[in-house]
Amino acid sequence: MGSNLKEIRKKITSVKNTQKTTKAMKLVSTSKLKKAEEMAKRSRVYAERITAVFQEIKAKIEQNGFSGLESPYFTAGEDREVKMVDIVFVTADKGLCGGFNSTTIKEVTRLMAEYKSQNVKVRLRAIGKKGISFFGFNEVELLDKVSDLSATPDYERAAEFVNKATTDFINGVTDKVILVHNGFKNMISQELKVQDLLPIKADAIEAKESLGMMEVEPSEQEREILDQLAKKYIEFNMYYALIDSLAAEHSARMQAMDAASNNAGELVKSLTIAYNKARQEAITTELVEINTGVESMK
C-alpha cells in the first residue's frame, strides 16, 4: 500500500509540473499573439493602400487603351489551360497548437488529390517545419521548402520565396499558383484560407475608394508599371499570409495550452482523491492490524 501511495504522489508532482509548463506556454503565446495582431493591423493598412494604388493605376491605364488582362499576371483561367499547379502553403515550425498544422496539411492533400483526378500536375512549395516534415515522411517531393520563416515573417525572404513561383507562372511553366494557410479569425478560432495567387483575379483588387492620383500618361512603360505593381501585390500577399498564420498559430497554441492546463488540473484533483482514498485505506488497515495484534495478546 505504501508503494502505491508513493506512485500516486509521483504522478501528482509530475502532472503539477506539466501544468506549470502549459500555463507558462499559454502566457508566452498570449504575449506573442498580441504582437502578431499588431503586425497584422499595420500590414492591413498597407494592404489597403497598395490595393487602392494598384486598382487606380490599372483603371487609368485601361482608359488609355491597355487591357490589364493582357498582362501575364491577369491571364484569365479560361484562356489558359491548367496543366500544372503550384501550391504554396504555410505551416508552423513547432507543434503543441491543436489542429493548426493538420488543417493546412489536410487541405493541401485534398487539393493534390483533386487536381490529380483531373490529370493536372501539382508541385509543392512549403514554408514551415511541420509541413516539410509531414510530406517528407510520406515521401512527397517538395519543389521548394524553407523553415524558420513562418516563426519570424520577413518581407524580403517571403518575396524571394514566392517570386520563384511567380517566375515559373510568367514563363508558362505553371498555369496557376495557389496559396494555402491557416489564418487568424479571432482569439479563439482560426480560419483556413485558400487563395488563387496567380493569375490575379480582377475582383481581388477592387479598390474601395479613389486615391485621387495623378493621371497615368500613355507610354510604352504602361504594362511594366502594372506588372511591377502586380509583383509587389503577390509579394505582399505572401508576407501577409505569414503574419496571419503566425497570429493564428499563437491563438491555437494559447487554446491548446489552456485546455492542457485545465485537463492537468482535473487530473490532479482525480489523483488527489485517489491518494486520499488509498491513504485512508492504509490507515484503516494499520488500525485493524494493531487491534488484531492487541486481541491476540490477551
Swiss-Prot record:
Localization, UniProt: Cell inner membrane
GO biological process, any: proton motive force-driven plasma membrane ATP synthesis
Organism taxonomic ancestry: Bacteria, Pseudomonadati, Campylobacterota, Epsilonproteobacteria, Campylobacterales
Matches recorded under SUPFAM superfamilies: ATP synthase (F1-ATPase), gamma subunit
Keyword Transport: yes
PANTHER family membership: ATP SYNTHASE GAMMA CHAIN (PTHR11693), ATP SYNTHASE SUBUNIT GAMMA, MITOCHONDRIAL (PTHR11693:SF22)
Keywords: ATP synthesis, Cell inner membrane, Cell membrane, CF(1), Hydrogen ion transport, Ion transport, Membrane, Transport
Pfam families cross-referenced by the UniProt entry: ATP-synt
The protein's role, per its UniProt record: Produces ATP from ADP in the presence of a proton gradient across the membrane. The gamma chain is believed to be important in regulating ATPase activity and the flow of protons through the CF(0) complex.
Membrane topology label: Peripheral membrane protein
Domain of life: Bacteria
Main location: membrane
Gene3D superfamilies: 3.40.1380.10, ATP synthase, gamma subunit, helix hairpin domain
Subunit details: F-type ATPases have 2 components, CF(1) - the catalytic core - and CF(0) - the membrane proton channel. CF(1) has five subunits: alpha(3), beta(3), gamma(1), delta(1), epsilon(1). CF(0) has three main subunits: a, b and c.
Protein family: Belongs to the ATPase gamma chain family.
Record-given protein name: ATP synthase gamma chain
One example GO MF annotation: ATP binding
Keyword Lipoprotein found: no
